[in-house]
Amino acid sequence: METVISSDSSPAVENEHPQETPESNNSVYTSFMKSHRCYDLIPTSSKLVVFDTSLQVKKAFFALVTNGVRAAPLWDSKKQSFVGMLTITDFINILHRYYKSALVQIYELEEHKIETWREVYLQDSFKPLVCISPNASLFDAVSSLIRNKIHRLPVIDPESGNTLYILTHKRILKFLKLFITEFPKPEFMSKSLEELQIGTYANIAMVRTTTPVYVALGIFVQHRVSALPVVDEKGRVVDIYSKFDVINLAAEKTYNNLDVSVTKALQHRSHYFEGVLKCYLHETLETIINRLVEAEVHRLVVVDENDVVKGIVSLSDILQALVLTGGEKKP
């Protein structure tokens, strides 16, 4: 079941930003987010893939690959409502839970329906779908993404019950960047990562070039991270293995052999891979944001002058600093 959603017209974006004094510049992005609705961010036409929970898991993951999307809302025909999201994280959890060896077919992936997987995986921990109204502010959207530790937030029309769009950190930051030059620049934009202490610098989850994919999947599950820097024997970053790379196992139908190294698994994208996107502690927040938006990536690896991994800065970290804490270290 696939749906293509088109809105009638391009949303009008307000140009009237509140007048800010130099002392209050640190809250300009917060004010911007509070004065714009989720609807303002929805494009004129966008494709949305929706899965019925009675669909086989395997077919659903192949459909994600075919449509070039990372997640899809789940529709329960019995309840006549959206009940959750199917994401690459589900694919990782299924592979990690049921993989035995390259010689044994993963029955659960081949035969389970989405609803069966959800019953097994969620058991008694069923949570209502986290979603947002198109009339809610972007500030509320950012708050919900960060508070619930999710990467995708469906925008659902409360009247029709239809899913209109899926908000992500990436799309929100890109929208903010379109108007960023219209604001007085907050003081914190010129400060360094080290000064602002934005990002994660302790217990960074990493893998070696020789780490088997199955072990990497276990790290994703245990640490709940979206990417793993791949390092050499000296701790220098040479690649990055992200959750998105895992879906390629479905694309190439190679998910029955998870004993191969992450380096081998990443060869599929070697012809267009431009290298790991990095940053340094002395670089300013403004520089970091520009790099993230221009490269359209979800995180940067913080390194020292020898390319040794020091931390990770994610879009979630950036939005939290810009919108929720006004450049201050997160509470």
UniProtKB/Swiss-Prot annotation:
Q: Which GO terms describe its cellular component?
A: cytoplasm; cytosol; membrane; nucleoplasm; nucleotide-activated protein kinase complex; nucleus
Gene3D superfamilies in the record:
CBS-domain (3.10.580.10)
UniProt binding sites for ATP 2:
R70, R152, K170, S242, K243, F244, D245, R269, L277, H298, R299
Q: Which gene encodes it?
A: PRKAG1
Residue numbers binding ADP 1: M85, L86, T87, I88, T89, D90, V130, H151, R152
Q: What is this protein called?
A: 5'-AMP-activated protein kinase subunit gamma-1
Residues that coordinate or bind AMP 3: H151, T200, A205, S226, A227, H298, S314, L315, S316, D317
An example GO BP is: spermatogenesis
By sequence similarity, the record places it as follows: Belongs to the 5'-AMP-activated protein kinase gamma subunit family.
Name the segments for region: Disordered: 1-26
Q: Where AMP 2 is bound, by residue?
A: R70, K170, S242, K243, F244, D245, R269, L277, H298, R299
